[in-house]
Every structure is written in structure tokens, then in C-alpha cells.
């Protein structure tokens, strides 16, 4: 079976993946490879599990691109904890346990453009029915319906479409939950980070304060057991605070509210922009550069984030100065964990004439 759970490790996901099944259903989206090439690759890859039957079908998607389905049956259960185990070249294979091989095979063969088979198909075992008796029709339970949907769906869109057609009332009343489960079943593959913000030279009266904070907290790695320090910048709008903060490297960026569902474990730092003190969730953990804490995403399950200590850059305009809303205890914690820079009149995080520095 294929399972997922929470984990703070992993480059592509914070989930723990496990697949163990003799029958495996694979989908290669936007994949133009020949079925024979895919099938022979799967046969060599799973030789230790004694492959008995492989079916690979190529068909066209609604947008005109090719994609391939494969049914792999082995004598021994195919076991892996690597969600990229079945990847071929740059094409990622979505892995599902084929709990109903008959239905999976029927689904794969619904509209084939090219097909390749090897071995002898092993049909699903059926319950014994005495001679002269017809098997009773049994209405599938919701669990069975959802199991079939999760087995056959190949994308978030197809998953939600199948839920809508099979369970219309649940889809209408619990759409948020289905959207969350769709995002967990079909997570986005993390792309290499590209910084969209050019570096800027700031025009400050006290550059040393910023430089002294940057070196140990952004440019240097943590020593074992060491925690970073955050940075608080308060000042007028259009002084380049946001552009400068976002130009330093890979980061989590939140403006107006914090969405934990998009938390990037590979980020070097966080940016909290224009979020009032009293409306910033987990502010103590963010300011204190803590790690391995539990958050509660909207419409999602509680999860652990921050596998490492990273600093947070907090940006505020003068009318939302965090220090004005703090109790003495808040101020004490803030000063112990966060450097502060209050912009004076005329100070900017860009030189006059630089493009993109007016945020």
C-alpha cells in the first residue's frame, strides 16, 4: 500500500512516503515516451520482485498532450520509500496501489493510442458464488467509492471531478476538505528557486546595524544547537523595505496573513510583511527562530514545520508598529531574540534612481 505521514525531512515534501503492493498503478503525466520503452524499464527496475505482468498504455489528455498509464503486477510485493522510484528520465511516475486490478486494467484500456504488454495478467480473485445463484448487487460504501477515486485519479482536477460526480452532496458541503486532500495526494513538485528581486544598495545612516545582522543570520550556517536572531524594520511606506528583504535569498513570504500550507522547508528565512502584532500567529516561534513547532493551516490538518532554525524579517509601517501593542513581557522577549531598525526620515533601502525600490 502507499501511505503518507508527516515528516520534517525530504527535499521535495514534508511527507513520509511508503509503497508496498504486488499490484502497482502508475501514471506519467505529459509523457511522450513509447510504452515499450517504459515497460522494459519497469521490467528491469523491478526484477528483484519477479514481475509477472506489465501493461503500458499511451493516450492523449484533454489538452492534447500525451500521458501514459501502467499496471505492474509482481509475484513479490514491490516495496519502496522513494516517491521517485519509478521516475524515468525527467518524467515523474505517480504511484498508486492497484487494489482492484480488473478495474484499473479496464480504466487503462478505455481509450488507448499505443499499447505494450508483457507477461500474463493475473485477474483479481472473486468471491465464490454457488451454481444457479446470481451474485447480489451491493451498493458501494463511501469508503469504497473514495478508495476507487484515489486509486484511479491522476491529478487534482480529475480527483475533484470524480468526487463531484460520485458524491455530489459531500462535494457541495465539504469541498474545502476535498481540496485539501487533493493537494496532499497530488503535491506540487518543488521547482528550483529563482530570486525575482534584484539586490539593492541601501541608503541608511547606520549601515553597520544591518550588515552586522546579515552575516551571522543569513550568510552563515548555524552552529550545532545555535538559534538565529530575527530582524524588525519599522518605517514609512515606499522606502524599499520589502524589495530589500525579498532580495536576500530563498524565503517564505507572508503579507496581510500567514498561510502555513505553503511553508517551504528549504527557505533561508521568513518575511512577515504588514501583519499587525495581534494578528500574527505563532509570532513567538517566528521571532525566536524556533524549530519543529506545530501550526494549524486553514482548512487543513495540524502539521509540524521548521525543521531548522531560520530568522524572520518583520516589516511594519509606522501606524502598525509592533512595539506599540506589546506588553512589557512581549518587549523583553522581542529584544532578547530580535534586532531592530527604526527608519529615520530620508532613509531608504535603495539608492535614489534605483528601479524597483519603492515598496
From Swiss-Prot:
The record places the motif (Nuclear localization signal) at 298-309
- One Gene Ontology biological process: DNA replication
SUPFAM superfamilies, per this entry? Origin of replication-binding domain, RBD-like, P-loop containing nucleoside triphosphate hydrolases
- Which positions bind a divalent metal cation? 59, 67, 69, 111
For this chain the motif RCR-2 maps to: 67-69
What residue intervals hold the motif RCR-1?
25-28
Q: How does it assemble?
A: Homooligomer. Rep binds to repeated DNA motifs (iterons). Forms the O-complex, which is a Rep-DNA complex involved in the initiation of RCR. Part of the C- and V-complexes which are RepA-Rep-DNA complexes involved in the c-sense and v-sense transcription.
Specify the protein name: Replication-associated protein
Q: Which organism is it from?
A: Panicum streak virus (isolate Kenya)
Its taxonomic placement starts with: Viruses, Monodnaviria, Shotokuvirae, Cressdnaviricota, Repensiviricetes
